[in-house]
Amino acid sequence: MSLITVENLSVRYGANTVLRNVALTVEPGEIVTIVGPNGSGKTSLLKAIIGAARPAAGQVTLRPGLRIGYVPQRLHIDATLPITVERFMGLTARVTREDCMAALKIAAVPDLLKRQMSQLSGGQFQRVLLARALINKPDVLLLDEATQGLDQPGSAAFYRQIEDVRRETGCAVLMISHELHVVMSASDRVICLNGHVCCAGTPAVVASAPEYRALFGTGTGGALALYRHDHDHNHDHDHEAAE
């Protein structure tokens, strides 16, 4: 059974329809990236999946018992608030130090447990958010522009870490990004969204799709130069451009 199934989903805010007739699935262990221009409905789609936005039509079905880890687009913490990484990770649920350490290790920042949140660099902060999302051993990670504010090397390092997380934990990943040249290389499937699904498939299929090039131009073809994903598992998702 698919982890997440979205069927004919439409989302409206007042009279404004931001998503219409969107359909997609997320299968166990795969990395799916949603790309699209600003205002294309990417964040609204994630909100509908986690129940933070009510569909105007269609439905979202989660596999029974599905555990979701969520890494938000941004999170502001008052710099004057004295809070350690360990305390931050236990704010919303009771967790042991061992759980914190295990999650931080998977996120490749095992030495930050006692560090003040206000002292973290941008990259360290995002990895702590990743560790917090991993602490309950999710079946799927949802990432909403999780590298916003990082420079290109920092973003690339973060997405490489996401691949490592998938290999180590087996969890699926559904992520939103505008950094096409980086995330293309880390994805099993790419879904191009602009209020509806323009095209979907492997990075190679999507990068050559007319719908994708109409939105992003031909210059993004360089994304495929980074397409170094070497699978040790199979997904039957080389599907054609969607209407």
From Swiss-Prot:
It is found in: Cell inner membrane. It comes from the Bacteria. It is a peripheral membrane protein. SUPFAM superfamilies: P-loop containing nucleoside triphosphate hydrolases. Its EC number is 7.2.2.20. It catalyses: Zn(2+)(out) + ATP(in) + H2O(in) = Zn(2+)(in) + ADP(in) + phosphate(in) + H(+)(in). Keywords: ATP-binding, Cell inner membrane, Cell membrane, Ion transport, Membrane, Nucleotide-binding, Translocase, Transport, Zinc, Zinc transport. The keyword Nucleotide-binding applies. GO terms for biological process: response to zinc ion. Its main location: membrane. One of its GO terms (molecular function) is ATP hydrolysis activity. ATP binds at residues 36-43. InterPro entries: AAA+_ATPase, ABC_transporter-like_ATP-bd, ABC_transporter-like_CS, Metal_Ion_Import_ABC, P-loop_NTPase. PANTHER family: METAL TRANSPORT SYSTEM ATP-BINDING PROTEIN TM_0124-RELATED, ZINC IMPORT ATP-BINDING PROTEIN ZNUC. Part of the ABC transporter complex ZnuABC involved in zinc import. Responsible for energy coupling to the transport system. The complex is composed of two ATP-binding proteins (ZnuC), two transmembrane proteins (ZnuB) and a solute-binding protein (ZnuA). Belongs to the ABC transporter superfamily. Zinc importer (TC 3.A.1.15.5) family. This is Zinc import ATP-binding protein ZnuC.
